[in-house]
Amino acid sequence: MASLAKNILQFRSKITGKLNTPDFRVYCYKNNKPISFFHDVPLTSDKDTFNMVTEIPRWTQAKCEISLTSPFHPIKQDLKNGKLRYVANSFPYHGFIWNYGALPQTWEDPNVIDSRTKMKGDGDPLDVCEIGGSIGYIGQIKQVKVLGALGLIDQGETDWKILAIDINDPRAKLLNDISDVQNLMPRLLPCTRDWFAIYKIPDGKPKNRFFFDGNYLPKSDALDIIAQCHQHWKVSRDRKQYIKNFHNESVNNVDLINKINSLKEEVSQNVSNYPSFPYFHTIPNL
């Protein structure tokens, strides 16, 4: 466990701007240089442990995500029609009901038809719902155990949701597959499916639909989905025509590195010293 912890302690966060503003950014640093959350954080810590980049802490509403179109792929708050995006509170839920994030070095290729769903990918890294009891923070790299997957249909595209638990959670040793989640946390799976079904309704969109009638896939399928999306990332990372700045040539751009290093830091701490819940904002008029 100590060696696993050491694997992620080599990464630090540099936060510029403030949450709830368009200038908010979280950069990933290694050896005092900015790196890419998407390309440079490894997918795994060992054969059974995956690295998850936390984008949205549990119970919060700001829609933050890794930006695939920005140099070094920082996390930023998403914009739509020039306005910052938030997820509405859909009764009885408050914000996101798990720590939500992405698996680095994975890509749901929009040019490839998924063998299970028969639909193309959504063009993003794989999403992760981390179901542990602790509340993460934006940019935190959590080491997680994969448990299963839920297939969401997003505007005619495949949008997998990987369910996982922080390996440091007390329940992690008891949860080894999606069936264990059903037995130990019986309300979590139906609530997760319900949340994804209704969360866009306050924005005037219809109820979301699922592949496989909303049934969860077991760990073995989830691991296979991850392996496929990791392969898509490997194959496509040099095809710059697919995603602007997808190829990580920016790591050698000295001027760009100096520009990012010169940005005013709001927070710059080792993850082990970071406050457990630094972002709690009451968002009005949702």
Curated annotation (Swiss-Prot):
Binding site for Mg(2+) 1: D122, D127, D159
EC number(s) given by UniProt: 3.6.1.1
Entry keyword annotation includes Cytoplasm: yes
Cellular localisation: Cytoplasm
CDD domains: pyrophosphatase
Cofactor: Mg(2+)
Pfam families: Pyrophosphatase (PF00719)
Annotated residues for binding of diphosphate: R85
Gene Ontology, cellular component aspect: mitochondrion
Enzyme class: hydrolase
Keywords on record: Cytoplasm, Hydrolase, Magnesium, Metal-binding
Database matches in PANTHER family: INORGANIC PYROPHOSPHATASE (PTHR10286)
Protein name: Putative inorganic pyrophosphatase C3A12.02
